[in-house]
Amino acid sequence: MGRPYVTLNLNGMFMDKFKPYSKSNAPITTLEKLSKALSISVEELKAIAELPLDEKYTLKEIPKIDGSKRIVYSLHPKMRLLQSRINKRIFKELVVFPSFLFGSVPSKNDVLNSNVKRDYVSCAKAHCGAKTVLKVDISNFFDNIHRDLVRSVFEEILHIKDEALEYLVDICTKDDFVVQGALTSSYIATLCLFAVEGDVVRRAQRKGLVYTRLVDDITVSSKISNYDFSQMQSHIERMLSEHDLPINKRKTKIFHCSSEPIKVHGLRVDYDSPRLPSDEVKRIRASIHNLKLLAAKNNTKTSVAYRKEFNRCMGRVNKLGRVAHEKYESFKKQLQAIKPMPSKRDVAVIDAAIKSLELSYSKGNQNKHWYKRKYDLTRYKMIILTRSESFKEKLECFKSRLASLKPL
């Protein structure tokens, strides 16, 4: 017989497929090695670490549906660059994720090599055909992930040690906890239960249950009606308690197909594949109808408000595409007929963006990461000008100016 709980990594070593692991066994121990891995100089790494805390993170308050406020932070540009590199060069490149984790999981780094998009739709699909579902919500997840958990992620999964380890732990936390709004936080949150979560999943599978976690949402399902989840819920609560992670009792519930259609991450799972609830499709249709009425009014399609409403509506239609809904192509075609149109305001915004690039280029910044982002964003802003012949001359002028400002 084979070994059902292990798989071979790239180095030919047997790895537990219920735990995340690194493709590389080479330890990163010094700032010099970290600098090489991230392509950021040691001097720059030190300069970023020495930024005042209130410059690294700027507090923002976002209203929640229940009337309370969510505290998030925006990053200093240099912190954003550093954390982006950590994500790209370490989490995305090196970590192989077990199949029960969804959200911040690159599809290419799947332990099953399935190359499936690991988003909320794929997560819901794992539970299709369920007749009883347990949902456990972790309360204020990021705010309760202590630096000790962050350290264990970098040290035990990624073999990062010594001064490189302490540096990364400091960069990825604020006041000893993970930061809501930091680029690295969702990866850390996805990985931080690695030491014990695999054992809970094994227990679930032995009982014929399906276990998934999408960041802070744990879902366990059974194809048996009125399944008793008390033992499994106890295992999950113990796992979270051991990591000092509180459960949101209000959002932790058991759902039965006999009483209502079962939904996971907003999608119905009482079919062979995930479906949007019928009332959601009706709301999308109504939204398109209202947008058409708005588009018929003079100059509306050039307004900021219309553009915002169009993008929101397109996002909802794209959800239909993700679940292969029969109305997707029809709704998309209707929206494409009423796209937002350019205005003189767009010309002014693009002109200002190119002037800013010209100034940055003259100062020799064309090899900087932030310069490339500004350049790409400016090109993106120009797309809307292609929708009107009236702006053809301006568009060609902008293209000509940008051609001499390419990043290195």
UniProtKB/Swiss-Prot annotation:
Alphabetically sorted, this entry's keywords are: Antiviral defense, Magnesium, Metal-binding, Nucleotidyltransferase, RNA-binding, RNA-directed DNA polymerase, Transferase
Q: Which family does it belong to?
A: Belongs to the bacterial reverse transcriptase family.
Q: Which gene encodes it?
A: ret
For this protein, the record's CDD domains field holds:
RT_Bac_retron_II (cd03487)
RNA-binding recorded as keyword = yes
Q: Name one GO molecular function term.
A: metal ion binding
Instruction: Name the species this protein comes from.
Output: Escherichia coli
User: Which sequence ranges form a coiled-coil region, renumbered to this chain?
Assistant: none
Task: Sum up the protein's function in the record's words.
Answer: Reverse transcriptase (RT) component of antiviral defense system retron Ec48, composed of a non-coding RNA (ncRNA), this reverse transcriptase (RT) and the following membrane protein. Expression of this retron confers protection against bacteriophages lambda, T2, T4, T5 and T7. At multiplicity of infection (MOI) of 0.02 cultures grow normally when infected with lambda without collapsing, at MOI 2 cultures enter growth stasis. At MOI 3 cell membranes are permeabilized within 15 minutes of infection but do not lyse, suggesting the phage are not able to finish a replication cycle.
Q: Which residues form the Reverse transcriptase domain?
A: 43-269
Presence of the UniProt keyword Nuclease in the record: no
**Pfam family for this entry, one:** RVT_1
Query: TM spans, by residue?
Result: none
Protein EC: 2.7.7.49
Q: What class of enzyme is it?
A: transferase
Q: Which reaction does it catalyse?
A: DNA(n) + a 2'-deoxyribonucleoside 5'-triphosphate = DNA(n+1) + diphosphate
The name under which this protein is listed is: Retron Ec48 reverse transcriptase
Residues that hold Mg(2+) according to the record: D137, D216, D217
Q: Please name the PROSITE patterns in this protein's record.
A: RT_POL
A single GO BP term for this record reads: defense response to virus
